[in-house]
């Protein structure tokens, strides 16, 4: 195991345009960090640079205190798990898991011992004599993880390993990866576009956007205090409702652009840096909009209602803004019904319209 450090890491492909704009992060020994963001944000490029599959244009990458910029992937003491498994079809599970050690000249007895140990961790014992074509998608991904485990690396790198699996298998594999990290405590960097994977697996999340690390923090902090409108809209399913408008001079109401006046008394409290009488982007998550007894509320004309099982999502519009409200299972408003909607001050977020950055 080892700490991983990125200092001012930039990437360009020969021109003036950078695809990574200076990433700075220190990942502690044994920490599980997830790089999350949409396609094209730079997360996979950054992972490939850590792995040594892409060169570093500027900055330094260090593993265990050793700068690895000039080292080949095989010399970085890393192991990588890919989206497409990358198993040899003519080899058995055991041979696939041990092949990386074999080509490095490791003794057969040690290879067998490590393969057996990894198979026990991943419950692959009964499958060791099978070939990849005889395995399910989830089993193949466990074999790919086993191949990484037998290396006993300082750092695990996961490149969207669950993308090829169906929804049920993704849930199962998330749990297995959590258990694996709890058992091995190996420094891990995991890339995904799926914010649910990021929230459930990470000790810290790095939200990537257009080559920048938009926010770095614990999943709960990123969810509860998004640093920008991008993070607010990307982390959370459904996304945070973001409303353009103006806070009244007394700070008690928010006038949605081309929409209704909303009661927000107490939202611009002392010390939050939220000036009344100016334009803001107001954010509120769908689960925080169900009114409690005695609360002031606005109303929303329901366009549709999604029945999700444990809860429901009502959808409507305020002006040009789509609005989603999460409701208890028993609340199922129909199209055209008027729904009372709360905007509790403690759950409101304000963002600067010019920069998209959080206030307060």
From Swiss-Prot:
It is an enzyme of class 7 (translocase). One of its GO terms (cellular component) is ATP-binding cassette (ABC) transporter complex, substrate-binding subunit-containing. Its EC number is 7.6.2.10. The keyword ATP-binding applies. Residues 4-235 form the ABC transporter domain. InterPro entries: AAA+_ATPase, ABC_transporter-like_ATP-bd, ABC_transporter-like_CS, ABC_transpr_MalK-like, ABC_transpr_MalK/UgpC-like, Mo/tungstate-bd_C_term_dom, NA-bd_OB-fold, OB_MalK-like. GO terms for biological process: carbohydrate transport; glycerophosphodiester transmembrane transport. Belongs to the ABC transporter superfamily. sn-glycerol-3-phosphate importer (TC 3.A.1.1.3) family. This is sn-glycerol-3-phosphate import ATP-binding protein UgpC. It comes from Burkholderia mallei (strain ATCC 23344). The gene is ugpC.
